[in-house]
C-alpha cells in the first residue's frame, strides 16, 4: 500500500530559509571561488552548477523514499522513519526548486531519468527487504555528505544563505545515515557490494548532473 506521505504533490512543501543567527555561524571571511585557477568556473557558473546538481539529487532522494514506501507501505516497522526522512527530503527539494527558479539556474536535462531511476532504486532495494532499504539510505547519504561538504567549503561570505542551507541539509542527511545504520543496514544481504554499487551510482549521478 502506498503511504499518503509518498504522494505529496511537488511544490506544496514550504522551502527552508536559514535564520540571521545561522548566517553568522558560517562566515569565513572568504569569497566564493576566490582561489579558483584559470579554466575553473566563475563564481556564477559554480553556483549554477551547485543548484543544478542539488536539485537533481534531492529529486532523486524524494523518489527513492517514495519507492520504498510504495513497496513497504504500512507493513514496515520502519514506516515512521521512512516518512520522516521523506518529509525532510521534500523540504530540501522545495528549497532547491525555489533557488533554481529565483536565480535562474539551468536544471539538469536528466530530471526525467532521475525521476524514474530514484523510484526504481527505492522500490528495488525495498523488495530485497527492510535492511536493504536502509543500506540504500546509508550509501546514498554517505555520498551526499562528501558532496555537500565540498560545496560548503567552496562557498564564501557572499553566499551565506546558500552555505547555511547546505550545512543544515548535510546534517540532516547524516541523521538519515545514522538512522539507516541503527535500523540494520549492515545486516542487508551482501551489504558491502550493495553499498558500494549504490555509492558509485550516486557519485556518477552527481558528476553527470553537474554538467548535463
Swiss-Prot record:
Function: Catalyzes the hydroxylation of 2-nonaprenyl-3-methyl-6-methoxy-1,4-benzoquinol during ubiquinone biosynthesis.
Protein encoded by which gene: coq7
GO biological process: ubiquinone biosynthetic process
UniProt membrane topology term: Peripheral membrane protein
EC number annotated for this UniProt entry: 1.14.99.60
Cofactor binding, note field: Binds 2 iron ions per subunit.
Cofactor field: Fe cation
Pathway(s) served: Cofactor biosynthesis; ubiquinone biosynthesis
Binding of Fe cation 2, residues: 89, 141, 173, 176
Protein's cellular compartments: Cell membrane
Protein name: 3-demethoxyubiquinol 3-hydroxylase
Top-level taxon: Bacteria
Organism: Rhodospirillum rubrum (strain ATCC 11170 / ATH 1.1.1 / DSM 467 / LMG 4362 / NCIMB 8255 / S1)
Location of the region described as Disordered in the Swiss-Prot/TrEMBL record: 1-22
Feature: compositional bias, Low complexity: 1-14
Top EC group: oxidoreductase
One Gene Ontology MF term: metal ion binding
Family: Belongs to the COQ7 family.
